[in-house]
Amino acid sequence: MAKAVTIKIKLVSTADTGFYYVAKKNSRTMTDKMVKKKYDPVARKHVEFKESKIK
């Protein structure tokens, strides 16, 4: 079997609320860390979410 191209990652809130999203990422085309601006319901505002590994 071939190695999977898409991997699951965890996008953790930079507001230190502990909230996170799970997203997919193409590891061949996106080699750098993913950063997205999304809504954090705990902080009740839009903040940056940074990539971390799923344990």
From Swiss-Prot:
Query: Keyword Ribonucleoprotein: yes or no?
Result: yes
**What domain of life does the UniProt record list for this protein's source?**
Bacteria
SUPFAM superfamilies reported in the protein's UniProt record: Zn-binding ribosomal proteins
Report keywords, A-Z.
Answer: Ribonucleoprotein, Ribosomal protein
Family indicated by similarity: Belongs to the bacterial ribosomal protein bL33 family.
Q: Which GO terms describe its cellular component?
A: cytosolic large ribosomal subunit
Name of the molecule in the record: Large ribosomal subunit protein bL33
Q: Mention one GO biological process in which this protein takes part, according to its record.
A: translation
Q: Which residues form a coiled coil?
A: none
Organism field: Rhodopseudomonas palustris (strain BisB18)
Q: What InterPro entries does the entry give?
A: Ribosomal_bL33, Ribosomal_bL33_sf, Ribosomal_zn-bd
Pfam families, sorted: Ribosomal_L33
Listed GO MF terms: structural constituent of ribosome
